[in-house]
């Protein structure tokens, strides 16, 4: 199985994977220029994610190892999510009574999203998990698993 692991300073002990650490590569924020749709379809003007895009779209499974900050994803992960836009077409379709970007590719990977816990209430955790599930639903992932990091095997904190 072709797997990509996207992490925030949490090492993953896995074989046959492509590992992308958001703490090692500075992901620039989307500047909203629309070049990924109009000038260079499918390619962002910032090129630090080019290799990741290839591995991401060809993977069967993506595993996220994320840190929760103040009850939400980090700014690094949010910038990463925003920069996934080149993987979709600049058109909108109505699917299940909601607007979604049209997929650029015929296949999108399944997602396992594991997070370090930092919630004061169960309701905060529920809102967070629903946000992550909705994000990957919009990213056309068919199988979406969202769980605390303690539920994931073979990870260790990087000092």
Labelled PLM ranges:
Residues 3-6, 110-119:
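Short hydrophobic beta-strand segments
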Residues 96-100:
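Alpha-helical scaffolding within the catalytic cores
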Residues 68-70, 117-122:
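Short histidine/acidic/glycine/proline-rich micro-motifs that form metal-
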Residues 120-159:
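Glycine-rich phosphate/pyrophosphate-binding loop and the adjoining helix
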Residues 101-109:
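Short, conserved loop/helix-junction motifs that constitute active-site signature segments
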């Amino acid at each position: 199985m072709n797997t990509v692991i996207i992490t925030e300073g949490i090492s993953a002990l896995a074989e046959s994977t492509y590992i992308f650490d958001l703490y090692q590569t500075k992901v620039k924020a989307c500047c909203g220029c629309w070049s990924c749709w109009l000038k260079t379809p499918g390619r962002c003007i910032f090129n630090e994610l080019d290799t990741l895009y290839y591995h991401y779209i060809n993977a069967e499974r993506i595993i996220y190892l994320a840190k929760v900050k103040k009850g939400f994803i980090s700014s690094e992960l949010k910038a990463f999510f925003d920069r996934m836009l080149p993987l979709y077409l600049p058109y909108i379709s109505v699917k299940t009574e909601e607007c979604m970007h049209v997929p650029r590719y015929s296949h999108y990977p399944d997602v396992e999203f594991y997070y370090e816990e930092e919630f004061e209430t169960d309701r905060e955790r529920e809102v967070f998990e629903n946000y992550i599930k909705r994000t990957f639903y919009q990213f056309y992932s068919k199988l979406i698993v969202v769980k605390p990091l303690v539920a994931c095997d073979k990870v260790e904190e990087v000092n």
